[in-house]
Amino acid sequence: MNIQQIVEQLKQNEVVAYPTEAVFGLGCNPNSESAVQKLLVLKQRSVEKGLILVAPCLDYFLPFIDTTAFSQADWDRLQAKYDRPTTWVVPAKTTTPKFLTGQFDSIAVRLCDHPAVKQLCEQAGFALTSTSANLTTLPPCRTAEEVKTQFGADFPVLDLPVGEATNPSEIRDLFTHQLFRQG
């Protein structure tokens, strides 16, 4: 599918696969509980784990993140360019749905400079949920063909290459720098 077709799927609250910095992600409209539920069922993932949001700029995250405790250093860290994809765990607004945050009062966000993510967010008008495109026992997909093999030939996938990163994103707490996942 092309960008416009994937955007239409997103607007219809469907789950899609799209390329990120290292692997294909499964994503949907984070404002749609029904879309997120489809994603969780597809991934056999507990709602308690919470989800990552990706977008090309911070504006897309502002409806979900509580920035009241952010220092200038926190803003700088969140927006900095790193040698690997970096996801930051930040405080969530009290209005952020539990189907995104799970058992936490925080949410994970990643600025993603992959052109596909940029185009999808700009055309859809929202950030995307992001979890690796793979079934539980299989490795994350790195090509559109691998996505179709795992999820079926008709699964909506944006057939563009992934970025240059070799590993999925590192996940850290923005304030404490605690490492949750090595990148």
Curated annotation (Swiss-Prot):
Q: What is its main location?
A: cytoplasm
Q: Does the keyword Transferase apply?
A: yes
User: What PROSITE patterns does the annotation carry?
Assistant: YRDC (PS51163)
Q: Does the keyword tRNA processing apply?
A: yes
Please state where this protein is localized: Cytoplasm
Q: Which UniProt keywords apply?
A: ATP-binding, Cytoplasm, Nucleotide-binding, Nucleotidyltransferase, Transferase, tRNA processing
Query: What GO terms fall under cellular component here?
Result: cytoplasm
| EC number, UniProt record | 2.7.7.87
Reactions catalysed, as given in the entry = L-threonine + hydrogencarbonate + ATP = L-threonylcarbamoyladenylate + diphosphate + H2O
Q: Which Pfam families match?
A: Sua5_yciO_yrdC
- Read off the InterPro entries from this record: DHBP_synth_RibB-like_a/b_dom, Sua5-like_dom, TC-AMP_synthase, TC-AMP_synthase_SUA5
Q: Name one GO biological process term.
A: regulation of translational fidelity
Domain YrdC-like positions: 1-183
Q: List the disulfide bonds.
A: none
Question: Which Gene Ontology molecular function entries are recorded, alphabetically?
Answer: ATP binding; double-stranded RNA binding; L-threonylcarbamoyladenylate synthase; tRNA binding
**What is the documented function of this protein?**
Required for the formation of a threonylcarbamoyl group on adenosine at position 37 (t(6)A37) in tRNAs that read codons beginning with adenine. Catalyzes the conversion of L-threonine, HCO(3)(-)/CO(2) and ATP to give threonylcarbamoyl-AMP (TC-AMP) as the acyladenylate intermediate, with the release of diphosphate.
The protein's matches in HAMAP family, at most eight in alphabetical order, are given as: TsaC
Q: Which family does it belong to?
A: Belongs to the SUA5 family. TsaC subfamily.
The protein in question is named Threonylcarbamoyl-AMP synthase
Q: Which organism is it from?
A: Pasteurella multocida (strain Pm70)
Instruction: Name the encoding gene, please.
Output: tsaC
